[in-house]
């Protein structure tokens, strides 16, 4: 029997993979008449000063409003966006899903933080290994083609 998802989380960071994940999450939310939670996590370890943090915050609020407008335009009846601060792995994989009763997390195969991916593993890998709910990992055609070679 197929799952009927009620609360879907999509994590976005501005990458192509995140945009693909967003599109798939919108389709799933619409098909299931589910709530769509659009999440962006600002990794506070990457900021050197307050002014760079403030400008990033303004940019992210605008981007998140755009994502939510796209979801509404596509027919998602209940959508929200959140900007959280801290460790993306922990927030995406545990804290946010628990707080919002998420039953499906949709993420891109890779994100923008290449340094963290090299040093300590990707957020996506961590989420798929440790999350308590279903996780859908979305790959762009370029990544899928590269994996076939």
Label every model-predicted segment.
Residues 73-105, 144-149:
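Structural beta-alpha unit
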Residues 39-65, 144-149:
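Acidic, proline/glycine-rich short linear motifs
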Residues 98-146:
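Gly/Ser-rich helix-loop-strand patches that form or flank binding pockets
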Residues 21, 60-63, 123:
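Hydrophobic alpha-helical membrane-association signature
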Residues 21, 48-51, 91-94, 117-118, ...:
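Short, well-ordered secondary-structure micro-motifs
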Residues 2-54, 74:
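Small/aliphatic-rich secondary-structure junction motif
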Residues 37-39, 80-84, 136:
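General small-molecule cofactor/ligand-binding pocket signal
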């Amino acid at each position: 029997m197929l799952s009927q998802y009620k609360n879907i989380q999509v994590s976005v960071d501005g990458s192509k993979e995140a945009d693909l994940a967003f599109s798939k999450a919108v389709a799933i939310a619409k098909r299931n008449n589910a709530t769509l939670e659009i999440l962006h996590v600002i990794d506070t370890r990457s900021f050197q000063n307050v002014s760079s943090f403030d400008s990033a915050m303004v940019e992210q609020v605008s981007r998140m409003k755009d994502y939510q407008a796209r979801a509404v335009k596509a027919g998602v009846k209940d959508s929200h966006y959140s900007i959280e601060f801290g460790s993306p792995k922990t927030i995406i994989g545990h804290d946010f899903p628990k707080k919002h009763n998420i039953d499906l997390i949709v993420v891109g195969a890779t994100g923008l933080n290449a340094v963290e991916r090299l040093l300590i593993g990707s957020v996506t890998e961590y989420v798929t290994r440790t999350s308590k709910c279903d996780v859908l990992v979305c790959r762009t055609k370029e990544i899928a083609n590269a994996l076939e070679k």
